[in-house]
A protein has these predicted regions:
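Structural signature of nuclease core domains in nucleic-acid processing machines
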Residues: 1-231
């Protein structure tokens, strides 16, 4: 319904990270729902959205900074802004609704992410998205499966321990301290993204989408013949 009517919004945000390097800018376009109370929206065509979720979470944060600052400016001018801080992530079988964030908190989260981004050239940062997603929203066994992989008959679905970036990170970790064993599940709950999402994990709504079951051609023909015989 209202998800069909969408438009793009340009954001241009400035942040003072107090790092001695001046202001940091975040500029980009976000897809939002139409109507009188637009909110951020994104579509994922995969059932497994773990690898997309945290990227969407980052967009959600900057969208809330955008909305919060516009709302503050609008109130000062006597014209409150109506953009919604809620965000919707659509997959092929679920609707994920992320709650609006208070402006002060959204700005703090945004600053944390920008500091992390600015420091990546000097200090690598390991983040296992699928394993962390499983820790937040799924069972412990699924955390292990996301990291170690799964054997299904003769097929193997690789886990994040086989990821080339993780392997490289572990390989060079010995240069700055104790080497990391790439086959051991690392501590996941001390990352920025885990801590941020954990604060709101109980407020994130997940609704199942009803997927119509396709009717085979032979079944349609049988039903048509039955209908003709009843007439």
């Amino acid at each position: 319904e209202h998800y069909v009517d969408t438009s793009k919004v340009t954001i241009d945000l400035k942040f003072d990270l107090q790092s001695g390097q001046g202001l940091e800018s975040v500029v980009g376009e976000l897809l939002v729902t139409g109507g009188s109370n637009p909110g951020l929206i994104e579509l994922s065509l995969s059932k497994n959205i773990a690898s997309r979720f945290f990227g969407f979470w980052v967009k959600h944060i900057f969208w809330n900074v955008h909305c919060g600052r516009l709302n503050n400016t609008g109130r000062l001018n006597g014209h409150p802004h109506k953009d919604s801080g809620e965000s919707t992530l659509l997959s092929i079988d679920k609707i994920w609704t992320l709650p609006a964030l208070p402006l002060e908190l959204a700005e703090r989260y945004a600053s944390e992410i920008l500091r992390l981004s600015c420091g990546l050239e000097k200090e690598p940062y390991a983040f296992l998205a699928k394993s962390t997603f499983a820790l937040l929203f799924e069972k412990e066994t699924q955390v292990k499966s996301a990291f170690k992989g799964i054997n299904i008959g003769s097929s193997v679905i690789q886990g994040e321990r086989d990821d080339s970036y993780w392997q490289r990170y572990c390989m060079f970790s010995g240069d700055t301290g104790s080497p990391i064993n790439s086959d051991e599940l690392p501590v996941l709950n001390d990352t920025i993204f885990y801590k941020q999402v954990l604060d709101f994990v109980e407020q994130i709504e997940v609704a199942e989408l009803e997927i119509p079951v396709p009717v085979s051609k032979s079944k349609r023909e049988t039903e048509a013949q039955r209908g003709r015989s009843e007439q």
